[in-house]
Amino acid sequence: NRHYENVRYPDSWEVVKMGEMVRIISGVAYSKSDVTVSGIKVIRGGNIQAGEIIECDDDVYIDNRYADPTNNIYKGDIVLVASTGSQQLIGKTGFATRDYVQTQIGAFLRILRPKDIRCADFLNLFFQSDYYRQYIRSLAKGTNINNVKNSYIEDFVIGLPPLQEQNRIVAITNKIFYMIDEILAGL
């Protein structure tokens, strides 16, 4: 992508396409007649808030015949809003901090499953960045519905530090976010 053409990275960093780092998994399509009071919970766009996957009062459940372990949400997965009418919501992501039992994603979402789970926290930081969101918004524009094509994610080029450096970046960033949360809580 042209935004990275003039970026210089330390020699120890690799320049990789996101498709080398994550596997993209599509969500389940179902009809209203498939909705039940229990079974498999379906995560939808409203469940993705502030970088997290949350429970909602209006969560939907579908019949267990839709069960597919590949489409379950596992710790380290990044859930992406891939189709929506809102430019503000397109591309937003939520990070799975645990396995979600009996839970899959709806058809308008995608799971970005890190190929190396050790990189999950670093990739999550990247997908929370304004840089990523601006990139996605610039590509996903539609007349009514905005869509993130898999190729937008797969072809996106990032700088990837060695694992030890990834962990250091994540630790420092998390510490800063924690301090910000503490300050905001005190206001």
Can you describe what each PLM-predicted range is?
Residues S31-S38, S138-A140:
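Short coil/turn segments at secondary-structure boundaries
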Residues G19-K32, G46-I78:
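Sequence-specific dsDNA recognition surfaces
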Residues N1-V28, G159-L187:
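Non-catalytic DNA-recognition/assembly elements of restriction-modification systems
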Residues F126-I158:
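Specificity-determining recognition surfaces
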Residues K32, Y100, N144-N147:
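Short proline/glycine-enriched turn/loop segments at secondary-structure junctions
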Residues R44-G45, A67-Q128, K149:
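A short beta-sheet element
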Residues E5, F108-R110, Y152-F156:
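Short amphipathic alpha-helical segments
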Residues Y9-E20, L112-F126, Y135, D155-Q164:
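Catalytic cores of nucleotide-enabled group-transfer and carboxylate-activating enzymes in metabolic
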